[in-house]
Amino acid sequence: MLTYPQIDPVALAIGPLKIHWYGLMYLIGIGGAWLLASRRMKRFDPTWTKERLSDLVFWVACGVILGGRLGYVLFYNLDEYIANPTLIFEVWKGGMSFHGGLLGVMLAVWWFGKRHGKSFFQLMDFIAPLVPIGLGAGRIGNFINSELWGKVSDVPWAMVFPNGGPLPRHPSQLYQFALEGVALFVILWLFTRKPRPTASVSGLFVLCYGIFRFVVEFVRVPDAQLGYLAWGWLTMGQVLCVPMVLAGIALMVWAYRRDAAQPKAA
């Protein structure tokens, strides 16, 4: 059994103002994505400037935060937030949905593309390899918050979490960091080293994330207010990942078939 590192969720307190690690992880993720995007920007479009890139990152970040929070409210805990709507604004306590954040990003990208003459999938293919940076940072934030831990386990790396009871559990946040953050980043980075058909990068991202999240959900404790939705093992996260996997496969097939059907330059 490993010892859980006792980390104060508050990174910095200035009088009554408290800066939480969870929020800092979002800033780190957004900042890291911007730095990587600035390196890849000219390859995406030589006419782009840092100002246009910053504009894109800003709207995508808004989509992540607003979509992620509203997605959690709608998918995971609607009754509680209807009873006490002010809880929606307490984001430092956690409660973000990746699937809601993805929908928020899609809306932001669609709107941005309309303004700047880029197709939806051109922008999504550019953004997709950047997303694992934010996902990985977010999972570290979950770990510091001692939330979203896994089931009771006797594996050598199990941990006793401060608010997870006296028994050691799977550190499922770290599993998700390794898969959604590190592995997904490497897969997409290697895949995009060569030119790919439009929408194929987006398809690979959606497919891999759906698979990784579906697998980790087997050892992660579901949200208490929802529990298991069917057969004693199917969680809300898994329900939301099934259409992602199907959509990812469909997108990749469509992208490559569309590319093959286009006439090639002599």
UniProtKB/Swiss-Prot annotation:
Family: Belongs to the Lgt family.
Function: Catalyzes the transfer of the diacylglyceryl group from phosphatidylglycerol to the sulfhydryl group of the N-terminal cysteine of a prolipoprotein, the first step in the formation of mature lipoproteins.
GO BP, sorted A to Z: lipoprotein biosynthetic process
Species: Pseudomonas aeruginosa (strain ATCC 15692 / DSM 22644 / CIP 104116 / JCM 14847 / LMG 12228 / 1C / PRS 101 / PAO1)
Keywords from the UniProt entry: Cell inner membrane, Cell membrane, Membrane, Transferase, Transmembrane, Transmembrane helix
Main location: membrane
EC number(s) on file: 2.5.1.145
First-tier enzyme category under EC: transferase
Localization: Cell inner membrane
Known pathway: Protein modification; lipoprotein biosynthesis (diacylglyceryl transfer)
Keyword Nuclease: no
Protein name: Phosphatidylglycerol--prolipoprotein diacylglyceryl transferase
Membrane topology note: Multi-pass membrane protein
TM region positions: 10-30, 56-76, 92-112, 120-140, 171-191, 199-219, 233-253
Binding site for a 1,2-diacyl-sn-glycero-3-phospho-(1'-sn-glycerol): 139
GO cellular component: plasma membrane
Gene from which the chain derives: lgt
A molecular-function term among this protein's GO annotations: phosphatidylglycerol-prolipoprotein diacylglyceryl transferase activity
NCBIfam families from the UniProt entry: lgt (TIGR00544)
